[in-house]
């Protein structure tokens, strides 16, 4: 089976959506994937409609889609991967915690995927609950910020992540903010000036290592001003 391309899906999501509402989308459209590109484009149209639609309608449409997919194991795997790319991937314009949570609820309940295959979806759903815009900021080892703070999350074993320390620090938009670098994984501890450093052992329970380098901005009142954003 052809593997799902996050890059292709993101391009498709940005291209626009078809006319019509989302609630009846999968009653009007097939889940056929014999033409993989057409199926991917069709799902991209659905994802754009879903994130813009009333939540009740979007969730109802998700149920219709999953009910169809339960009769097609190969399609279930394929569409589950597309949902991961559309509703979880940071670069996707359709990243959405509610819709991703709905997808994970169905994936774990429907019994098509094996329990061990559901685990990555469950972990991503948990990661997605942290540091959403307007919610309480959370970094292991920090009770609260005492000033507006730029938090950069990086993989200590990733050269690109280490490069982000210098690139982000040099950006004038962050002048005047406290700067906290949260290092995850294994590797030499960075020493780029201008940053406070934190290396929490439990960091990967909160942050997706594969998503780094990312940053978010926390306010002195303990809330998230700007959610996760690619640092480079």
What are these regions (language model features)?
Residues 141-170, 178-183:
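Short active-site neighborhood of thiol/selenol oxidoreductases, capturing the structured segment around
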Residues 17-141:
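Oxidative protein folding and maturation machinery
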Residues 4-14:
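Sec-dependent N-terminal signal peptides
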Residues 152-157, 181-184, 199-201, 219, ...:
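Active-site proximal loops enriched in glycine and acidic residues that flank catalytic Cys/His/Asp
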